[in-house]
Amino acid sequence: NKSHNWYENDINYGIFIILHQFLSALSSYIGVPADAVRRDYYIVQMMQNLQNSEYAEVCVFKGGTSLSKCYPGSINRFSEDIDLTFIPVEDMTNKKYSKALKRVEDTISAGFLMEKIEDERNDRNKSAFVWPENESKETCRVKLEIGSSVRPDPV
């Protein structure tokens, strides 16, 4: 039974401490708050979850985060959210679409804690806050938005 708790394994705890020290040093060096640097690191981890999944080809990465990650230097900011448009390969009923979005959401947030934003969720759109269990939700949460009701093109 595999646990996601960093503190149950001395090696993982050591890696966690080294990572925090590195990200804190990077934060000081570039003059960006440590929470922003850590959140940006976790966004990259979440996007790696997507990239390594069967959903990589049916999700369009868009918005400011996509510009900062895919076109370095295009905008100078650290990210707080992940915006995706899901483009299914076949027509789907609302129920099937909702289930597919939930699977994408679960894939991206694997290894993280998640809190659904209920008033922003329906069959065609899912929103949630995602953060690592060893971090504060208030300082390291990432807003994950997956949907279909907006243009898939980066804006």
Language-model features and meaning:
Residues N1-V155:
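Compositionally biased terminal segments of proteins
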